[in-house]
Amino acid sequence: MVLLLLVAIPLLVHSSRGPTHYEMLGRCRMVCDPHASRGQGPDGAPASVPSLPPGAKGEVGRRGKAGLRGPPGPPGPRGPPGEPGRPGPPGPPGPGPGGAAPPAGYVPRIAFYAGLRRPHEGYEVLRFDDVVTNVGNAYEAASGKFTCPMPGVYFFAYHVLMRGGDGTSMWADLMKNGQVRASAIAQDADQNYDYASNSVILHLDVGDEVFIKLDGGKVHGGNTNKYSTFSGFIIYPD
């Protein structure tokens, strides 16, 4: 009886202080106080955490998303002036009195003649860039087009040298404002070169364009030899 009291009294005292954990070590009971401080040294001071050496450098992360678009910057410096444009067609007659009529037999001077320097193939406008004659400046070598400056009747002729040798043929059309007005064909009959030629007389109004368009095949470029040529002139004005 006395032994039971000796065991029960300590248990009642500890249970009144709070929850207590204990373990059995053989025949001895070890009581653990949950309120005891943790992570302290022998003198009650906080225990220091041992420092570890730095690890290896990690890899570069992925690139982030692009940010919001910023405001437009200031305008840049002014660029150089462009090249002068082509002269426009003559305007309509003004309200003033008409000028004197041209003398009888007067013919305006409009004529051009140009050769082809570089080869062409496929489907493109032939730009006869080796200009020999351009009276009136109505022909433009950069575009290969003649633009009518005065209404009237005009004559045009073209001769195009085919670059063959592979069994193909070549077609060349004279165009007026995108419509075919004359055609020529050269066929490769076991030859390396052959000619396609034609001529036409057309009535033109101011601003009408006349040019030669390749409709398949290959055209030989003659450097300055002028194997392929395009020419035209006015016969009489309206």
UniProtKB/Swiss-Prot annotation:
PROSITE patterns referenced in this protein's UniProt entry, alphabetically: C1Q (PS50871)
Keyword Magnesium in record: no
Record's keyword terms, sorted: Collagen, Secreted, Signal
GO CC terms, sorted: collagen trimer; extracellular space
Region entry Disordered, spans: 37-102
Organ and tissue specificity: Highly expressed in testis and adipose tissue, brown adipose tissue expressing higher levels than subcutaneous and visceral white adipose tissue. In gonadal fat pad, expressed at lower levels in adipocytes than in the stromal vascular fraction (VSP), which contains preadipocytes, fibroblasts, endothelial cells and occasional immune cells. Expression exhibits sexually dimorphism, with higher levels in females than in males.
Composition skew (Pro residues), residue ranges: 71-96
C1q domain residues: 105-238
InterPro entries recorded: C1q_dom, Cerebellin_Synaptic_Org, Tumour_necrosis_fac-like_dom
Inducing or repressing factors: Down-regulated in fasted animals.
Domain of life of the organism encoding this protein: Eukaryota
GO molecular function list: identical protein binding
Localisation per UniProt entry: Secreted
Collagen-like domain ranges (all copies): 53-96
SUPFAM superfamilies named among the record's database cross-references: TNF-like
Pfam family, one: C1q
GO BP annotation list: ERK1 and ERK2 cascade; fibroblast proliferation; negative regulation of ERK1 and ERK2 cascade; negative regulation of fat cell differentiation; negative regulation of fibroblast proliferation
Known function: May regulate the number of excitatory synapses that are formed on hippocampus neurons. Has no effect on inhibitory synapses. May inhibit adipocyte differentiation at an early stage of the process.
Quaternary context: Forms homooligomers, predominantly dimers or trimers. Forms heterooligomers with C1QL1, C1QL2 and C1QL3, when proteins are coexpressed; this interaction does not occur after secretion. Interacts with ADGRB3.
Protein name: Complement C1q-like protein 4
Protein's organism: Mus musculus
